[in-house]
Amino acid sequence: MLHTIVNCPTCAKQVIWDPVSKYRPFCSERCQLIDLGEWANEEKRIASVEDEAMHYTFENND
């Protein structure tokens, strides 16, 4: 049986994408919590069209 292998988004360790991998796509609870903390601290965000438009406006107001 072939398994899909992904890299943990936090530490890049290889993880089997399977229900047996409890924290997938993370390799461990630690990496999962590090990622959650980054989202909570607003170090990560999903870009939107509005974000890009605001960036363009601010750049051109110099």
UniProtKB/Swiss-Prot annotation:
Question: What are the entry keywords?
Answer: Metal-binding, Zinc
Record carries keyword Glycosyltransferase: no
Is the keyword Protease in the record? Answer: no
Residues where Zn(2+) binds:
C8, C11, C27, C31
Q: Which InterPro entries match?
A: DNA_gyrase_inhibitor_YacG, Znf_NHR/GATA
GO MF terms, alphabetically ordered:
DNA topoisomerase type II (double strand cut, ATP-hydrolyzing) inhibitor activity; zinc ion binding
User: How many cofactor units bind, and how?
Assistant: Binds 1 zinc ion.
GO biological process terms on file: regulation of DNA-templated transcription
Which parts pass through the membrane? none
Q: What are the required cofactors?
A: Zn(2+)
- State the protein's purpose: Inhibits all the catalytic activities of DNA gyrase by preventing its interaction with DNA. Acts by binding directly to the C-terminal domain of GyrB, which probably disrupts DNA binding by the gyrase.
Subunit structure and binding partners: Interacts with GyrB.
Q: According to its UniProt record, which protein family does this protein belong to?
A: Belongs to the DNA gyrase inhibitor YacG family.
Q: Could you tell me what this protein is called?
A: DNA gyrase inhibitor YacG
Protein species of origin: Haemophilus ducreyi (strain 35000HP / ATCC 700724)
Taxonomy of the source species: Bacteria, Pseudomonadati, Pseudomonadota, Gammaproteobacteria, Pasteurellales
